[in-house]
């Protein structure tokens, strides 16, 4: 399995939801926040790459597969708040890197929305309704670590840009910050791989190997009712 921040973050918040989605392959419905995020990201990416605004918005709607709740007005409004300009940087930079130097190291991949200043600055656009601090999780720290590996830069200024509020949360990630994020990812990746091996030997013990962690996230989880039935007898 190739890991990503979102996979690791999901596992940390609820191993059972991770199991349902990434081990059993159960698809989750495309919600409005997810579809809107995809549309806005595509519109901003196209704008930076020189596409005219109206065409960029249309491409965003196509990217979201014309989700019935996503409107061109919402996509245009949020994309415009990014202040994106043609040529301001490289967009959607994809990376796949080993998390350590061992032969069978877990692999981490990611897509960075915007890279500029020769890899020493990155931005991740957010359509969230609630802003948070860039250090509240390890997403941007991992992206900064990837920039360090790819561009050999001594530091990376990482920014979350919350489009609804035109609000930034930034931090200058030094090697120690990058290492902290890498170790977090490596620890979880190794834990998941160990559990996958155990599940391969004892599939009937899936409830103990990948337990559910009840939280406020259950309100938005498509597996919540099934989860309640599954774990009520444990």
Please give the residue ranges for each predicted region.
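Nuclease catalytic cores
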Residues: 5-52, 92-93, 220
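A non-catalytic, helix-rich entry segment at domain boundaries
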Residues: 35-101
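Flexible, glycine- and charge-enriched loops at secondary-structure boundaries
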Residues: 33, 133-136, 178
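Residue-level recognition of conserved beta-strand positions in structured domain cores
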Residues: 22, 124-127, 160
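An active-site-proximal "capping" alpha-helix that borders the catalytic cofactor pocket
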Residues: 137-149, 158
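Metal-dependent nuclease catalytic regions and adjoining charged, substrate-binding loops involved
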Residues: 2-3, 91, 104, 149-234
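Short helix-capping/linker segments at secondary-structure and domain boundaries
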Residues: 28, 47-56, 150-154, 229-233
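Non-catalytic protein-protein interaction segments used by genome-maintenance enzymes to assemble
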Residues: 96-142, 207
């Amino acid at each position: 399995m190739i890991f990503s921040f979102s996979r690791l973050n999901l596992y940390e918040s609820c191993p059972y939801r991770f199991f349902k989605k990434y081990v059993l392959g159960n698809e989750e419905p495309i919600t409005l926040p997810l579809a809107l995020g995809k549309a806005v990201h595509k519109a901003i990416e196209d704008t930076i790459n020189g596409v005219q605004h109206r065409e960029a918005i249309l491409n965003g709607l196509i990217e979201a597969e014309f989700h019935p709740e996503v409107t061109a007005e919402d996509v245009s409004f949020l994309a415009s708040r990014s202040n994106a300009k043609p040529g301001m940087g490289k967009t959607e930079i994809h990376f796949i890197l080993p998390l350590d130097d061992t032969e069978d190291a877990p692999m981490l991949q990611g897509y960075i929305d915007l890279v500029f200043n020769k890899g020493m600055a990155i931005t991740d656009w957010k359509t969230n309704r609630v802003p948070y601090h860039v250090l509240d999780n390890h997403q941007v720290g991992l992206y900064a670590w990837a920039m360090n590996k790819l561009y050999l830069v001594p530091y990376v200024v990482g920014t979350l840009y919350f489009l609804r509020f035109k609000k930034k949360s930034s931090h200058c990630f030094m090697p120690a910050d990058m290492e902290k994020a890498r170790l977090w990812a490596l620890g979880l990746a190794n834990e998941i791989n160990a559990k996958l091996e155990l599940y391969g030997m004892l599939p009937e013990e899936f409830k103990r190997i990948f337990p559910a962690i009840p939280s406020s996230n259950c309100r938005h989880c498509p597996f919540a009712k099934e989860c309640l039935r599954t774990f009520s007898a444990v």
